[in-house]
Curated annotation (Swiss-Prot):
EC number: 1.3.7.3
Protein name (database record): Phycoerythrobilin:ferredoxin oxidoreductase
GO molecular function: cobalt ion binding; phycoerythrobilin:ferredoxin oxidoreductase activity
Source organism of the structure: Synechococcus sp. (strain RCC307)
The family this protein is said to belong to: Belongs to the HY2 family.
Length: 262
């Protein structure tokens, strides 16, 4: 991909990118929701650079697909393709605080040491049963179905636990044919199941009171502030595109709630 993108809603295709089928599925599943472009500055719609050595340079492509709907403040896909160095899809749905909905989060990362893959419907108010109970009752059977097919990803840091549900599906799998098979046979259908449930919740969601909306906003801000501060992609993006671009991307696109309003 070298042609400049004109809109965040413009179809996004990156050559040889492992996660293209996942993004294509998500974009297709969202189509019935009357999508509108989400404002993203041109330098974040598509950015290219090189990594590797002078003798063996590797092309890096970082691109953003994004939209919004009446119930979803921001839907965005951060996409990175850098050959053997990295292949990433970070797909997040940020709901409007006018609706009592969790976040949808998918982090699909391929690095030289293996694949790190995570799916969740992340709560804005984890200790609030009104926010979580009905979601978790429907999420846990899906989680249990796919958890038994995948190796565990390891412990969650204590400080991160408020931002993940009991249905957090987190796995580390090896590169090569074994990992490829697990991605095709377990990770891909799990991604579809998690997204399907999320879109069902969006369809069913009804507008909440201004008081409830304020509570949800406070919870969302805690989540996005934490994610912006602890974003594990910061080092990789800085290496590829520099610190100034990376900080602007993290705070102005990926986790922009403090800069935007409904």
């Amino acid at each position: 991909m070298t042609t400049p993108r004109q809109s965040s809603l413009e179809p996004l295709s990156i050559a040889n990118w492992r996660w293209q089928p996942f993004l294509d599925h998500a974009c297709g599943a969202l189509q019935p929701l009357e999508l509108e472009p989400y404002p993203v500055a041109p330098e974040f719609l598509l950015q290219t650079s090189q990594t590797g050595s002078k003798s063996k340079p590797v092309q890096v492509t970082t691109a953003t697909w994004a939209c919004k709907t009446n119930k979803l403040r921001q839907v965005r896909a951060a996409c990175v393709e850098a050959g053997a160095a990295a292949s990433v899809l970070n797909f997040v749905v940020n709901p409007s605080t006018s609706y009592d909905l969790p976040f949808f989060g998918a982090d699909l990362v391929t690095l030289p040491a293996g694949h790190l893959l995570a799916l969740d419907l992340q709560p804005a108010l984890k200790t609030d049963a009104e926010h979580t109970k009905a979601v978790w009752e429907r999420l846990m059977p899906i989680f249990e179905r796919w958890q038994q097919r995948l190796p565990g990803g390891g412990p969650i840091p204590e400080e991160a636990k408020p931002y993940f549900s009991p249905g957090f599906l987190w796995t580390r799998i090896p590169l090569g044919s074994e990992g490829d098979a697990l991605i095709e046979e377990a990770v891909k259908p799990a991604f579809r199941d998690y997204l399907e449930l999320y879109l069902q919740l969006v369809h069913e969601a009804e507008e909440v009171s201004p008081e409830r909306s304020a509570e949800l906003l406070a919870g969302q801000k805690r989540y996005t502030s934490y994610r912006a501060e602890k974003d594990p992609a910061r080092g990789m993006l800085t290496r590829f595109h520099g610190a100034e671009w990376t900080e602007a991307y993290i705070h102005g696109v990926l986790f922009d709630l403090d800069k935007k309003w409904m």
